[in-house]
Amino acid sequence: MRLSQFHLHTTKETPSDAELTSHRLMLRAGMIRKLASGLYTWSPLGLRVLRKVERIVREEMDRAGAVEFQIPTIQPKELWEQTGRWQKFGPQLLKIKDRKDQVFCYSPTAEEAACDFARSELSSYKQLPVNFYQVQTKFRDEIRPRFGVMRSREFLMKDAYSFHLHDECLVREYENMKSAYSRIFTRLGLDFRMVQADSGAIGGDASQEFHVIADSGEDALVFSTGSDYAANMEAAIAADPAPRAAASEAMRKVDTPTQKTCEDVAALLGIELQRTVKSVALIAGEGEAQQFVLVLVRGDHEVNEIKLAKVAGLDEQRFASEAEIAEYLGSVPGFLGPVAPAKAIRVVADREVAAMSDFVVGANEVGFHLAGVNWGRDLPEPEVADIRNVRAGDRALDGGELKIARGIEVGHVFQLGRKYAEALDATVLDENGKAAVMAMGCYGIGISRVVAAAIEQNHDDAGIIWPDAMAPWQVVVCVINPKGDAAVADAAASLLQELRDAGLDAALDDRGLRPGAMFADMELIGIPHRVVVSERGLGAGTYEYRSRRASEAESLDKATLLQRLQG
């Protein structure tokens, strides 16, 4: 590839609306161009990177025994209604009508369509197990697209769907896919972690995420120093709290006229924040099943909404209004507690709160809190659940200490069980000739997201630093004055061919730019290896070589250069 014949359009300006480093650098490098909110055109340069990720993904999926197919991105409403996700998916599901007023959606994921394909193609257990995968564009109507292709509305994804007669077989394929994903991200040259996760809107019995480690990551990842335990914040669990200590104080009312937060109350009373209890008022359910719920966490902790939604009866809830708070508690926000409610309420306390003694909580009276409060003596024992976010320093289940890092989710694997197959009546005949609902797994990788995540992990002030496997070219041969010196141009072309013959993905920068501008472009677009061919170097029988990760260039003869690049 000669760059004089390639569309390479870099810019020096930093886009004002680009918040993440990857977004800024992809725009400056000319990898993407914005078409509309959350929609991006991939340039020839960006597409080279995208295709390299695709190739590795396909190779490892094929190696793992999956077979490629292709599902339409436009899918009928009826299919999504059968699983209940037409409504449940919410406004992220882009809904459209054709000229006959038939309603469709632009697929954000393809469990329904994959299951529909399987039920039409598979009739016997002898055809199982099977794992179908595709690399296909998806669309989610994000309310606020941001961060470039990191959270765009349209994105490229590899999604796979496996079908099984028995759960044991599903578990084996799940482990097979976890291994395949680990190979994919290892080959891409990324520092990644696999963590336990919540299944979210897709559902299922078990799921794990793959995250690229990056300080800019949106997700908090939790690790233990005592084992290989790892989970995202939504699913992370700390060890049980120590047993509750005996009461040592009498309950008393304290004057807190303007102190409405746990922090302010703790400061006023001169106590540690962890001795206070935070009360969150919610309304769960609808109609006759509606109930007022007071959720309690320690003052220095935060409610984990995912864990809370798994508590019986709390899968659908909202914050209570001030009018509802007044009706049920006879109080106002800032002074709430599980104390003498005006009407019957449900109290759900985090495990840590249930283990507290001599704590401080709102008195349900404006301007007052209660101190020295104890369960059993002053308040009835609450319903107990794990409903908080863990924190760095918490004790892990394995006895180690929990640590927290930031990550960018790039892959997710699920054991779906029979949720979709039952809804869509996807059955095969088993060994006894009886209809059996198939067990299902699904496995996704955000291919376009991987590109942005790799940049977040691999960059410096000059630009992108691609891992070799993802770079648009592994090596670029830069020619000094290609039009003015035929010998230099010929030597560069000859070297390019030798690099290709050696199996390297190489390009020739023969655009005739000034050396400084040419080198700056190569650093910006992240070329791992730069070789300079110049009249002076040829005279000495050497080439100037610089690794993108090195601070200085070095002069090498051809044999040493080829050995270095192939090593």
Swiss-Prot record:
GO terms for molecular function: aminoacyl-tRNA deacylase activity; ATP binding; proline-tRNA ligase activity. Keywords: Aminoacyl-tRNA synthetase, ATP-binding, Cytoplasm, Ligase, Nucleotide-binding, Protein biosynthesis. It catalyses: tRNA(Pro) + L-proline + ATP = L-prolyl-tRNA(Pro) + AMP + diphosphate. One of its GO terms (cellular component) is cytosol. GO terms for biological process: prolyl-tRNA aminoacylation. It is an enzyme of class 6 (ligase). Its EC number is 6.1.1.15. The keyword Aminoacyl-tRNA synthetase applies. Pfam families: HGTP_anticodon, tRNA-synt_2b, tRNA_edit. Gene3D superfamilies: Anticodon-binding domain, Bira Bifunctional Protein, Domain 2, YbaK/aminoacyl-tRNA synthetase-associated domain. It comes from the Bacteria. It is found in: Cytoplasm. Homodimer. Consists of three domains: the N-terminal catalytic domain, the editing domain and the C-terminal anticodon-binding domain. Belongs to the class-II aminoacyl-tRNA synthetase family. ProS type 1 subfamily. Catalyzes the attachment of proline to tRNA(Pro) in a two-step reaction: proline is first activated by ATP to form Pro-AMP and then transferred to the acceptor end of tRNA(Pro). As ProRS can inadvertently accommodate and process non-cognate amino acids such as alanine and cysteine, to avoid such errors it has two additional distinct editing activities against alanine. One activity is designated as 'pretransfer' editing and involves the tRNA(Pro)-independent hydrolysis of activated Ala-AMP. This is Proline--tRNA ligase.
